[in-house]
Every structure is written in structure tokens, then in C-alpha cells.
Amino acid sequence: MNTVKPESIALFCLTPGGVRLAKRLAAMLPLTCYTSEALQEEGFIPFNGGFASAAREVFSSFSALIFIGATGIAVRVLAPLVNDKLSDPAVVVIDERARHVISLLSGHAGGANALTRYLAGMLDADPVITTATDVNELAALDTLAFQLNARMTDFRAAVKTVNQMLVSGKRVGLWCDGEFTGALSRCDRRGFIPVSDLARLPALDALICVTLRRSLPPLPVPHWKLVPQRVVAGIGCRRDTPCALLSTLLDRQLAAQRLDPLALKAIGSVSLKANEPGLRQLAHRCRVPFETFSAEALREHEHRFPASSFVRETVGVGSVSGPVAWLLSQGNLSGETLREQGVTITLGVTH
């Protein structure tokens, strides 16, 4: 899943007019600008082996690519590189007179539609966006998911089904747990029908539920959970603890707090465990970052948790999982620490 960040945008220009427009844009937002050797100026990187070669080289390295020139040229160059709308970068094309800004690739998931609107506003140009939900002035489920940094089971199929329902005029409800009311109010919800009480649903064809809950009560309509990634897990373990055991215990701890595994945002441990195979494999399996903290950083918070002299002698701090979860969640812990088979797991929920 790709999210456009202003500091990770590459821009390609092929003509003198394109260079002038690139300099205009570079004065307003951070860009890495590429052009031919013949047109190179200060602040521009020359193509390495030509335009197509340079584009291929950076395609997976930036969150977004801007091409100043003909759409057809961009299509021909990028066609062999396109892989998946959930991971490909946003691609936007601008004509060198800055009359039109075109969202070409990864409109929702990559953020190309949002970038197109932003650039068009800066340039007083016409944004050209062709995704069905946008042209019908509706929100899209994949956009909502990325705005909330949320996951779903079978995300691709859910997005296809729900977006088609929205475009077809079906009644798709949108409900959230109270803790997400503020975040949801800042999201694009056009076309969704607000739902405040799961026990008193209006007439609906489908329902989206924004929640961290592991399970929901029985509902009379087709529904999908949209699960924001908010849960963090501090983990302490003995050397060479198998990933399978860590995974089983983590799932048990999440279940004890009635939290959906999709809500996991990060796992962490002490720096001494930075290369612990089981922990690294667990992070990879859960598709989350593995973050580590120095013993010194953890000692600042170990007074909040029961300490072990053995752990202190081994890693330099009397408690690992609690202080790690405290740091990852800014002190917003959830439930009791699991202690089993040489493993400790403490959960927290980020804001």
C-alpha cells in the first residue's frame, strides 16, 4: 500500500518548457527532478541511460512520479513496470503549459487523485480524474482505508465490491467505534450513509464497520470490518524462541483483549534482540515494522513494571515488553502482560 509523501516525488521533464514548469513546481514543494543532459540545469539530475532507463530505475523508489509531457510517452515507458495498484507509485502527467494535470496510475491507493488535485490547485490547472467514484463525486473504500491506515480481510475483493455498490447507487452504511469518530470526520465519506448504532440499522445494502474489535455482533446485512492499525506489541523472549510460538502467544494476547490481528501496527523489543530470528520473522509474517529500543531508553520506564534480575543481567534492563509497549504507544497500554514459556507480551494502542 502506497501513500504519497511530498518529499518522495520524482519529476521527469523532456523539453525546455517542461524544465521551466519543473522549476516552478520545485519552488513550491520538494521534488527530485530529472531531465536530459542537454537540458540539465542546477537542481536537476541527468537521465542515466536515457529517459526510459531513468524512469525504470526510480519507479519503485518514490511514492509518486510526475511526468511533464505527453501522456502517451509516459504510458509507453511505464507499461512494463506496472504491477499492482496497491503498491505501484502514484503517477501524474502534466502538459508543459500546465493546463491539465492527469491522474494516470494508482489514483486511490497510491494517492494520484489527491496529488492531481493538489498540483492542479497550485498551477490553476484542470484536474483530470477518471476513476468512477471520483467522477460521480463519491468516496472510495480504498481511499478511506488509506486515510485511516486501515486493513481489511480480502481487501482487493472488498474494494471492488463496495466501490461498485457506491457507484451503482446502493445504500452502503458507515459505522465506527467511538474512538474513531474524530478520525473518520476528517475522511472522505461522500456516498456512505452514516450509522450511529449497530442495533438500530437503517435500510442498507451493505455496511462498513471501522473498529479494532476482533468480532462484531450478528448483523442483518453484508458487512466488512475496516481495521485501523493502532495496536503495538512489546515483546521480550529468550534467544532462539521460535516464530511459531511467538505468533501463537501474540494471537492469544490479542484475543484476550478482543483485538483484531489486523489492528497490529508494530512490534518492538530491546536493541539486543534486533537480529533475533523469531522476532524478525514475526514482524515479516504480520507485515509490520520491528522496532527496537536501547536498554538505556527502556530503563527510564522500567519502574512502571515488574522487574526480573535475570532479564536485567541478560539485556541490561529489568523489564522489556512493558517499557517497549509504553514507548510505542506513548503510555496507552491495553490489558495485562502475557508471561508464558519465556515470552512476555504487552500491548498498547496508539492514538
Enumerate the predicted regions with their spans.
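Conserved mixed alpha/beta catalytic, RNA-binding, or beta-rich assembly cores of soluble enzyme
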Residues: 14, 18-24, 30-31, 39, ...
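Short phosphate-binding loop-to-helix
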Residues: 51-54, 74, 319
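Short, conserved micro-motifs enriched in small and acidic residues
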Residues: 68-69, 317
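N-terminal beta-loop-helix "entrance" segment that forms/cooperates
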Residues: 33-57, 276-277, 301-307
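Hydrophobic/aromatic ligand-binding patch that stacks against planar heteroaromatic rings
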Residues: 25, 119, 282, 325
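C-terminal non-catalytic interaction/assembly regions of soluble proteins
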Residues: 252, 262-323, 329-333, 339-343
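C-terminal edge-of-domain segments
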Residues: 204-219, 223-226, 324-351
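N-terminal basic/disordered segments at the start of proteins
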Residues: 1-38, 334, 338-350
